[in-house]
Amino acid sequence: MHKYRTHNCNELQISDVETEVKLSGWVHRRRDHGNLVFIDLRDHYGITQIVFTDQNPQLMEDASRLRYESVITVRGTVVARSEDTINNTLPTGHVEVLAVEFSVESAADTLPFVINTEKDAPEESRLKHRFLDLRREKLHNNIILRSQIISHIRHLMTASGFTEFQTPILTASSPEGARDFLVPSRMHPGKFYALPQAPQQFKQLLMVSGFDRYFQIAPCFRDEDARADRSPGEFYQLDVEMSFVTQEDVFSTIEPVMYDLFTKFTDKKVSETPFVCIPYNESMLKYGSDKPDLRNPIIIADVTEIFRDSDFTIFRENIKKGSIVRAIPAPKAAALPRSFFDKMIEFAISEGAGGLGYIQFSETGEAKGPVVKFLSPQQLESLKATASISNGDAVFFASDKKEKAAKLAGKVRIRLGEELDLLEKDCFKFCWITDFPFYELNEETGKIDFSHNPFSMPQGGIDALEQAKTTEELLELTAYQYDIVCNGIELSSGAIRNHKPEIMYKAFSIAGYSEEEVDKRFGGMIRAFKFGAPPHGGIAPGIDRIVMLLAEATNIREIIAFPLNQQAEDLLMNAPSYVEDKALKELSIMLSPSARKNAEKE
């Protein structure tokens, strides 16, 4: 018989009755019934009930003193449970093991929080004792699910003709839109490596190297603040790149992967392929967001022209100054109490708006509300037609400069979806957002900057760049760039790449970069493009967000084994931490006075 176990704790069935077995695991629960002691023994696979009887008083007494989460090995005989004690919620619920002997492999101290329930514990304690937290069923299952998803992704990609690569972790700093994690070089004092924000340049270089289809479950590092769906330091993505492809080729390659994943690991309804494509400008108009939740049926409408000649002075004057008006329908909300409308106004104010106008259309078609008196009957009918308003509905209005009005309308749409319980249940709604602006205005400098990935191919190529003379014309340029969105969560960005040096130099010059600066920052890739680069494109769906959706987790830390907290700290390993002066000296690093003072405190 094996030293520790003959079976796992999820394995024993009624067919194993009278079999002598040995099990090892953690003490999950203990119940003392006087002449009987029951222990639920848990391992990675499941739970088996162990019973100690007064036929062996010493063994039963020893079992009654076992602390929760102690690791034990038990030898005994499988017996059938009586009819009234069968537990159909457990795979092993028809049997139990009558213990003959047990040994304690490792005794547990007093627990900082309860393991055998899903009752919330303080997150700081959970992260500090993550090894305990990971024993809890929900989190344990999430990590198993993550492994299964990644394994299946590898299978799908390999079956589709992709080759898996590993790219460098120590690389050069590049502008990916977030701060780098820098690593000082001992051999080159004063110089730094950067942890890759993404393997962007390397995967493109692999295409130039003659490989056709690349993928990697890639670790990415960005020094950015935490969010519910974003880890503050490290995350993983399914990094993909393909040669000789169009945007549509990328879509038709990734859609089956997403569909297969979401149908395999959930019973919910999944959007059929091909996924709907929504141009960026249309998405901002209809949904007030570039990551729309299509479970929400509300469609925003532009009603600027209706208010342009209305008697509503505030909107009319705003329109003269370049503002717009967006209408956000609220289905079947006309009869709701005044408190609902006040609540929506308070929400808009909390989002930085001056307020939120609205109209209620009764079941008989009568219009009421603070805006009604400023509109003619014809304008009210035009409003209903333009915004698809029916009798019994209400409609809210957002007025501001185009970008601000769109974003406010989008937030109101989301809030209405929640308040009115409009979201379609038990489904995953996918869509592509396409035709992103190539450039944007930098809010701090007021100058032209790349809106997303600087390596994207502008639609129209170099001709489009050369023909755009004014700022307005430059801001109208679009890129072969796309996002895949599911239930309002951006799962990935991707693009057809700019593989021609002359187009890259021109695109960067418009954003204020000289050829020398481009060569300095992206020399390796530019040099490669001068030796025959294939047209190529790619995408990089976020592994963490995919797992988060499939696990129905509300926080990304619930699907990562050892996450950082919101302050980018690892409470288990005490990172980041100060290092000895000797190590700093070897790296030619000197702490600032304030950093030195903090180090001395510790």
Swiss-Prot record:
PROSITE patterns given in the database record: AA_TRNA_LIGASE_II (PS50862)
Record keywords, A-Z: Aminoacyl-tRNA synthetase, ATP-binding, Cytoplasm, Ligase, Nucleotide-binding, Protein biosynthesis
Homology family: Belongs to the class-II aminoacyl-tRNA synthetase family. Type 1 subfamily.
Region (Aspartate): 200-203
Matches recorded under Pfam families: GAD, tRNA-synt_2, tRNA_anti-codon
Protein name according to UniProt: Aspartate--tRNA(Asp/Asn) ligase
Coiled-coil ranges (or none): none
Gene: aspS
GO molecular function annotations of the record: aspartate-tRNA ligase activity; aspartate-tRNA(Asn) ligase activity; ATP binding; nucleic acid binding
CDD domains (alphabetical): AspRS_core (cd00777), EcAspRS_like_N (cd04317)
GO BP annotation list: aspartyl-tRNA aminoacylation
